[in-house]
């Protein structure tokens, strides 16, 4: 229904809308762990049925195989729905935050084997330095040196290094989403742009530009405004040319 709905401004269906570049199926998806699924009777029954039908044991290793197939089949099913609706934009599967591969390699294998043309990740240097809930615990990280952070996760396959593995040569890479996270400096956007290019990223989207009307009342993270953060805005323009 979303794909066949008409854009009120252009009169074009979203499936045919030329200003939509990609379809990301789920933003920051998560999946049950083997421990989690045992507390969900319906989902656990599905796994047990799969295990019995495939000669597998009821254990963590077998569940990883089940989850790998589940992720692949879900992506492929959604991919087919999108194509049947007439949309031709690349389909993207999000691999969430850095370190998400740690403990979840089966999810990555499932997406890799799927029909999705692209995979995505998030990039928020400094997020680990602020307690959750982030909005209730703001912290000025402008003077923070992130060089070690970027270097640490570039080659780490459980960080961002998985994006440069040979098996991902057939997948486009994108970033959704990124921000400088409580950092109002002018240097981070250009560094992020160079970092993404080094990882083979072809498209990156920030979350989110702050609208003019409420920008004077907003601050901290997810904050970019030409009038209220001119230094960041200038660096964003520079990053666009990197």
Predicted stretch roles:
Residues 1-113:
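Active-site mouth of glycoside hydrolases
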Residues 182-242:
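Substrate-binding cleft of secreted/luminal carbohydrate-active enzymes
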Residues 41-55, 137-153, 242:
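Charged, glycine/proline-rich intrinsically disordered loops and linkers
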Residues 21, 117, 202:
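Conserved acidic residues
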Residues 65, 69-72, 76, 80, ...:
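Glycoside hydrolase catalytic-domain groove-lining segments
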Residues 25-28, 96-98, 124-126, 178, ...:
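Active-site beta-loop-alpha junctions enriched in small/polar residues
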Residues 30-34, 100-102, 127-130, 182-184, ...:
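Short catalytic/ligand-binding loop motif for oxyanion handling, primarily in non-cytosolic enzymes
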């Amino acid at each position: 229904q979303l794909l066949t709905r008409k854009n009120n401004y252009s009169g074009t269906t979203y499936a045919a809308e030329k200003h939509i570049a990609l379809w990301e199926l789920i933003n920051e998806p998560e999946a049950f762990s083997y421990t989690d699924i045992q507390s969900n009777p319906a989902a656990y029954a599905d796994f047990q049925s799969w295990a019995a039908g495939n000669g597998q044991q009821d254990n963590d290793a077998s569940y990883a195989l089940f989850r790998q197939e589940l992720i692949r089949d879900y992506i492929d099913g959604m991919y087919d729905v999108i194509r049947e609706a007439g949309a031709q934009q690349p389909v993207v599967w999000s691999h969430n935050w850095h370190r998400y591969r740690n403990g979840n390699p089966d999810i990555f294998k499932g997406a890799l084997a799927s029909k999705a043309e692209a995979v995505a990740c998030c990039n928020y240097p400094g997020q680990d330095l602020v307690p959750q809930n982030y909005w209730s615990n703001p912290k000025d990280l402008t003077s923070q040196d992130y060089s070690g952070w970027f270097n640490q996760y570039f080659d780490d396959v459980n960080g961002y290094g998985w994006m440069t593995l040979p098996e991902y040569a057939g997948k486009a890479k994108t970033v959704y989403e990124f921000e400088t996270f409580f950092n109002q400096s002018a240097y981070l956007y250009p560094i992020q742009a160079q970092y993404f290019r080094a990882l083979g990223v072809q498209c990156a989207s920030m979350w989110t530009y702050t609208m003019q009307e409420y920008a004077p009342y907003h601050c901290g993270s997810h904050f970019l405004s030409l009038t209220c953060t001119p230094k960041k805005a200038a660096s964003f323009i520079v990053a666009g040319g990197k």
